[in-house]
Structures are given as C-alpha cells and as structure tokens.
C-alpha cells in the first residue's frame, strides 16, 4: 500500500501502515485519489525536525478529512499505535488539530508531517504515525536545507504537484468523486505563492550581466520555437563560418562566373545561385562555401558592394540569413548522412526524423505495396525531371535571347559609330578641297 507524491523538488514514495491505522490510511489514500493535496505547500519546515504540509491553502489552520468532504465530520479521532515509533528519518504522521486536546487522543484532518531527524521519541503517543518514506530521501535533504522565514515557511515554494496511488486496498466510499484530470489551483492558492521554483534567486548584481542572461534565455527560447516549427534542425545548431551569402545579383549571372570571381580568395567547395524550383529563374542570391574560414572573411570584406554584371552585390555570413539557406543545406545532406549540410561540426540529433529519411511510407492517404509504390515514385521522379529540364530549357533560351539582343545592340552601336566617323571624315575632306580651290583662285587673280 503505497502513494507516490510528486513535489517541486522531486518524487517521494510513502509506504502506509494499513493494518495498524486503517481509518487514517483510508483517509490519506482517498484524499490523494481525489487530488486534494495538489498544489499544497510545505508551510512549516523545521530543520532536522519535521516538514509539515496537507493544508491546500498553506495557512496551517485549514483542511479536512475525506469524511468531511463526503458530508461527515471534518476531523476523525487519532489512531495511536503503541508499537509505532518516530525512530527514523522519514516517518509520516498526521498532525493534530489545534482545537483538539492531545491528552484525549486528539483529532486529525488532512495535514501531515514527515520527520527530518532521528529518535524523535517525544512525538510517540501524541501523533498518528501511519507510514514511512520508502524512496526519495534526497528530496528530504533538499527540504531540510530550504531557507525559511521565522514561521518556518520556505521563501522558495515547495509544493506537492501531484499524487499517485500505487496500491489501494480499500473500496471507495459512496459519493466519492474522482476527477478525470488534476484540478487547477484555486485563486487562494495562487495568491499564497512566494518565489517560484523556476525563479533564480542569484539574479542579483551587475545590470549588464543580468541583461545578458535574459537575452541568452530569450535566444534559447526562440531557437526552440524555430526547432518546433521546422525552421531549424535543432535548437543548438551552429551556422557554418566558411559560407558566404551573396545577394542583389543580376539574374543573368551564372554559377561558374560567380565562382571564378570569388575563387581568387581561396579554394571554393561549392558556389550555387538559388533558383526558383518551378521556373528555374535566378532568385538573385547565392551561397559560396570556402574551404577555410579565413578565405571567407577576406572575401566578405573585399567583395562588399562590388559591381558584377552591372549590379552592386551585398555579401554577408550565412548565420544572418539562416532561413534562406535551409533548402541549400537540405540538398547537401546526401554528402554526409549524419551531418547538416555536409558539415561535420553540425551533427543533428536523432531525436526527430530528418527530412528525406524513411520516406518510403510517408503517404498515408493510400496504401501501396512495395512494387506499386516504387512505380509511383519512379513516375513522380520522371515527371519532376521533365519539369526541371523544361525549366532549364526555358531559362537557357531566355538567357540566350538576352545575350543575342545585347550583341545586336552592340553591333548597331558600333555601326552607328563607324558611320558617324565616316561622315566626319568626308566633311573634313570636302572642307580641305574647297579651301585649296580658293587659294588657287586667289593666286591666279594676282
């Protein structure tokens, strides 16, 4: 006969003395079963003595037995057993109601305490000892070390989060309503909160340092959000430092031209201009992967606002635009199955399935056998290949047309310049001939 109590500091398992104290253990089991203790605080902690809880309000003067909840008396008589002693740490006893007389045996409701010391024999015969801790002595150590005020209330809340009945030999009384899920804290319980379990008491000191901590927590939260929605493979991913993002490109700029321009800074592993999947048109940005980080840094400083194909480009590192290179990274996963984008230092967790892995059975709308599914996949692949080839042909044709048009314009301009020069030369020759005739006429007249 046991109960698991989940607290804000850890879990505790209590073994109950159901034969020696049947009425007390029945009361405790049924209160745990209806989640009566949920969100109840440890409101009285005396170091090396005891830790008291069981009052949902945390005031220390509230609470009632399961019999009172079912319409009976709020309290029930204590069950003092002469053979049960408070000799060890972790003994569990019912508290005595303040308005009851200890000499007459006392009465109890819902409050109980756990001993934090040994050989507390002066408690024997005064309180109903109905169980002992079987697991969770490390939690008792944490409770014993809690900082408390003068009344014994911990400054940082220590609360019961949940109770689980592991073994219950007693049938449920008539009228006992067991909730389907844990009830929400009441307004009175929320108002009794002090320092939350997740609040950091050490956040005191330099404001700049505190600001850094806050920003670090926010960044981690944002990264986890991006991981959940799929924008990041995992929250701790580090962007590659040897990859440059190049934007504001001319749509006619080719991959090989861009690679040739950037290759003067160092060896390039890949240079890819990102294109539209449907049309194959350039999206005017690219990623250039260098072998060394130093080469990427040099290219970053020297290629900023450089004119390429009549366009001034902008260069940045890829961590500034992590969303844009997601597709590019995904295409490189074939180079290293256990890495992100082919980089060894970007190892992805196996906690989630990677995109592209085990896709043979992702189609849940229709069920195919392996042969049918393979034929369907081959047809889809062939159709996609034809679509890509058509897109490339359209793009190549459009690019050739643009170059032909530019060549024709250059030829026309050259012809115009030649015509203008010929006209100018003829005009000068004509002037020279007229001038020579006038000189000859002048000489004859003399």
Swiss-Prot record:
Main location: nucleus
Catalytic activity: [protein]-peptidylproline (omega=180) = [protein]-peptidylproline (omega=0)
Record family assignment: Belongs to the cyclophilin-type PPIase family. PPIL4 subfamily.
Domain RRM: 242-320
Ranges of Basic and acidic residues composition bias in the record: 390-446
PPIase cyclophilin-type domain location: 1-165
Localisation: Nucleus
Species in which this protein is naturally found: Rhizopus delemar (strain RA 99-880 / ATCC MYA-4621 / FGSC 9543 / NRRL 43880) (Mucormycosis agent)
Keyword annotations: Isomerase, Nucleus, RNA-binding, Rotamase
InterPro entries given in the database record: CRIP (IPR035542), Cyclophilin-like_dom_sf (IPR029000), Cyclophilin-type_PPIase_dom (IPR002130), Cyclophilin_PPIL4 (IPR035538), Nucleotide-bd_a/b_plait_sf (IPR012677), RBD_domain_sf (IPR035979), RRM_dom (IPR000504)
Ranges for region Disordered: 375-446
Stated role: PPIases accelerate the folding of proteins. It catalyzes the cis-trans isomerization of proline imidic peptide bonds in oligopeptides.
Protein name: Peptidyl-prolyl cis-trans isomerase-like 4
